[in-house]
C-alpha cells in the first residue's frame, strides 16, 4: 500500500510582493526576485520589467523598459522564473485532486463491503420471508434474527416478534423446577408441603395434615393436588375383594373350563364313571410326565384285571365268585379308559394290512398320486432319503418328470422298484415319524383306512379290525 502523500502547505509556493516603501531599487528588485511575483494588493501576478506585455506605469502608459528609455539597447531577456513555479503549483493541485478521487471511492467501497458482510451473516440466520426460529426474534434489519439472551428472554416457537418474551421469576411461595432458556420459560412449582390446583390458581395452599375421622389416605400431597382420602369401608375392603376375585376366582374358572373341554373330547359318551376317570387322568398330564406314565399304567392294569376277571367268569359260570374288594369294569368303560391313554401307542402297535388279502405293495401303489397333496413339498427329498434313495437317484427322477407335482409319485415308484417287497406302508409311516411329520402320517393312515383298502390288524391277536 502506497504511503499517504505528504502535506504541502500552499504558502510554500506563494511569493509575497515586496512592500512599496522598501529601499530596494527597481533594478535590485528585478535582480533579486523573479520577473513574475504575486501582487499584494491586486491578488494576481504582476510582471515587472519592460517588453511586450508590460504592465502600465504609474502614469498609466505602456512603454519600453527603463533601459530603453535610458537610450540603451535592450539586451537579452532574463530567464523567466515564474513559469516553472506556476507549473509546479498546478501539477500539485492535479495530484491532490487525483489522490482524493481515489481515496473517497475506495473508502466508500470498504464501507459497502463491510455492510454486505454483516448483511450476509444475518441472512444466513433467517432467510427473507421466513419466521425466526425458536430462541430468537426479528431484528430491525430485514431478514435478520437476533438470539434471545439466556435467562432473560425466550421464544418457544417460530415468530416475527421484535423482542423476546421476558422470563418469568418464581414467586416467593414457589421453587424453580427448571430454569429459563432461550426456548422455554421458567417452570415453577409450589414448595414441598403446599399445592396449587384449579381452585387456587394464583397462590399455593398448605397441604392437609391428615384425613378426617373414618377416612384413610390413599394419595399423598403433590405440588398440584392435596391429599386424597376415602372412607375405610370403600377403601381397603374394596381392594381386598378385588384381589381375591382376581387371584382365586379367575384361575378356578380356567380350570373348570379346561376340565369340561377334556371331558367332552374323551369319547366316553354319557358314562359318568368313564368321564370321571378320563378327566382325572388328563388332569394328571398337568403334573408332569411321571404322573402321565402312572395314570397310563393304572389304566393298563385295570384292563388286565378286567380280562382276567372275564375269563374266570366264563370258566366258573356255575360257581359263585367272591368279588369282595375287586373292582369290576364293563368292557365299554375299559375301552373308554384305554382310548385316550393309548391313542398314539395303539396306532404304533396296530398294523395296517390290505383288506381281503390283497397284495400290500400293489395296494399301496394305488395311493402314491394322492400322497403329493399330503406330504409337504419341502419334505419330499428328505422322505426319499429316509427311504434309502441317493441324491443322484432323486435328481435323475426329478429331471425326468414332466412337472413338479409328479416328482413324488416318480420317486415313490423308484423306491418300490429299488426295494421290491420291502416297500411297505409301515416303512413309509416310520420314515414320516422320524421326520416329525406326524400330521402327514396320520392323514395317510386315515386315507388308507377310509378307502376300505386297508384295515388295522391288532398286534398279537391276529384279528383284523376295520375302522370303516
UniProtKB/Swiss-Prot annotation:
Gene3D superfamilies linked to this entry: Death Domain, Fas, Tumor Necrosis Factor Receptor, subunit A, domain 2
InterPro entries in the record: DEATH-like_dom_sf, Death_dom, TNFR/NGFR_Cys_rich_reg, TNFR_10, TNFRSF10, TNFRSF10_N, TNFRSF10A/B_death
UniProt PTM: Palmitoylated. Palmitoylation of TNFRSF10A is required for its association with lipid rafts, oligomerization and function in TRAIL-induced cell death. Palmitoylated by ZDHHC3.
SUPFAM superfamilies in UniProt: DEATH domain, TNF receptor-like
Gene Ontology biological process terms, A to Z: activation of NF-kappaB-inducing kinase activity; apoptotic process; cellular response to mechanical stimulus; extrinsic apoptotic signaling pathway; extrinsic apoptotic signaling pathway via death domain receptors; positive regulation of apoptotic process; signal transduction; TRAIL-activated apoptotic signaling pathway
Residue spans of the TNFR-Cys repeats: 107-145, 147-188, 189-229
Keyword terms, alphabetized: Apoptosis, Cell membrane, Cytoplasm, Disulfide bond, Glycoprotein, Membrane, Methylation, Phosphoprotein, Receptor, Repeat, Signal, Transmembrane, Transmembrane helix
Glycosylation sites: 156
Signal sequence annotation: 1-23
Subcellular localization, as worded in the UniProt entry: Cell membrane; Membrane raft; Cytoplasm, Cytosol
Disulfide bonds: 132-145, 148-164, 167-180, 170-188, 190-204, 207-221, 211-229
Subunit and interaction comment: Monomer. Homooligomers and heterooligomers with TNFRSF10B. Three TNFRSF10A molecules interact with the TNFSF10 homotrimer. Can interact with TRADD and RIPK1. Interacts with ARAP1. In the absence of stimulation, interacts with BIRC2, DDX3X and GSK3B. The interaction with BIRC2 and DDX3X is further enhanced upon receptor stimulation and accompanied by DDX3X and BIRC2 cleavage. Interacts with ZDHHC3. Interacts with PTPN6; this interaction enables the inhibition of T-cell receptor signaling via LCK.
Name of this chain's protein: Tumor necrosis factor receptor superfamily member 10A
Naturally occurring in which organism (per UniProt): Homo sapiens
Amino acid at each position: 500500500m502506497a504511503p499517504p502523500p505528504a502535506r504541502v502547505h500552499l504558502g510554500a509556493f506563494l511569493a509575497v510582493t515586496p512592500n512599496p516603501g522598501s529601499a530596494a531599487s527597481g533594478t535590485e528588485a528585478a535582480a533579486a526576485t523573479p520577473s513574475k511575483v504575486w501582487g499584494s494588493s491586486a491578488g494576481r501576478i504582476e510582471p515587472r520589467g519592460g517588453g511586450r506585455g508590460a504592465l502600465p506605469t504609474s502614469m498609466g502608459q505602456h512603454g519600453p523598459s527603463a533601459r530603453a528609455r535610458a537610450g540603451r539597447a535592450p539586451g537579452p531577456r532574463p530567464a523567466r522564473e515564474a513559469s516553472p513555479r506556476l507549473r509546479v503549483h498546478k501539477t500539485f493541485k492535479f495530484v491532490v485532486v487525483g489522490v482524493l478521487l481515489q481515496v473517497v471511492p475506495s473508502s466508500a467501497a470498504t464501507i459497502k463491503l463491510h455492510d454486505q458482510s454483516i448483511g450476509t451473516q444475518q441472512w444466513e440466520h433467517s432467510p427473507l420471508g421466513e419466521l425466526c426460529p425458536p430462541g430468537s426474534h426479528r431484528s430491525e434489519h430485514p431478514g435478520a434474527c437476533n438470539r434471545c439472551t439466556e435467562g432473560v428472554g425466550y421464544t418457544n416457537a417460530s415468530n416475527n416478534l421484535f423482542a423476546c418474551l421476558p422470563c418469568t421469576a418464581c414467586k416467593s411461595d414457589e421453587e424453580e423446577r427448571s430454569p429459563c432458556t432461550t426456548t422455554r420459560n421458567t417452570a415453577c412449582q409450589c414448595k414441598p408441603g403446599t399445592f396449587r390446583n384449579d381452585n387456587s390458581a394464583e397462590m399455593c395452599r398448605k397441604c392437609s395434615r391428615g384425613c378426617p375421622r373414618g377416612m384413610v389416605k390413599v394419595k399423598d400431597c403433590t405440588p398440584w393436588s392435596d391429599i386424597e382420602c376415602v372412607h375405610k369401608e370403600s377403601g381397603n375392603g374394596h381392594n381386598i375383594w378385588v384381589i381375591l376375585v382376581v387371584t382365586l376366582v379367575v384361575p378356578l374358572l380356567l380350570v373348570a373350563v379346561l376340565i369340561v373341554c377334556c371331558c367332552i373330547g374323551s369319547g366316553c359318551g354319557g358314562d359318568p364313571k368313564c368321564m370321571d376317570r378320563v378327566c382325572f387322568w388328563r388332569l394328571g398330564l398337568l403334573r408332569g410326565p411321571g404322573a402321565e406314565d402312572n395314570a397310563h399304567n393304572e389304566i393298563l392294569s385295570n384292563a388286565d384285571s378286567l380280562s382276567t376277571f372275564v375269563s374266570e367268569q366264563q370258566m366258573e359260570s356255575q360257581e359263585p365268585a367272591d368279588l369282595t374288594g375287586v373292582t369290576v369294569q364293563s368292557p365299554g368303560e375299559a375301552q373308554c379308559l384305554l382310548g385316550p391313554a393309548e391313542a398314539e401307542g395303539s396306532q404304533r402297535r396296530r398294523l395296517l394290512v390290505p383288506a381281503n388279502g390283497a397284495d400290500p405293495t400293489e395296494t399301496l401303489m394305488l395311493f402314491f398320486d394322492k400322497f403329493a397333496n399330503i406330504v409337504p413339498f419341502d419334505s419330499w427329498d428328505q422322505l426319499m432319503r429316509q427311504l434309502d434313495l441317493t441324491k443322484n437317484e432323486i435328481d435323475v427322477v426329478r429331471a425326468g418328470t414332466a412337472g413338479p407335482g409328479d416328482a413324488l409319485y416318480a420317486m415313490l415308484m423308484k423306491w418300490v422298484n429299488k426295494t421290491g417287497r420291502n416297500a411297505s406302508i409301515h416303512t413309509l409311516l416310520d420314515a414320516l415319524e422320524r421326520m416329525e411329520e406326524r400330521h402327514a402320517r396320520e392323514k395317510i393312515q386315515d386315507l388308507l383306512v377310509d378307502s376300505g383298502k386297508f384295515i388295522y390288524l391288532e398286534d398279537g391277536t391276529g384279528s383284523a379290525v376295520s375302522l370303516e
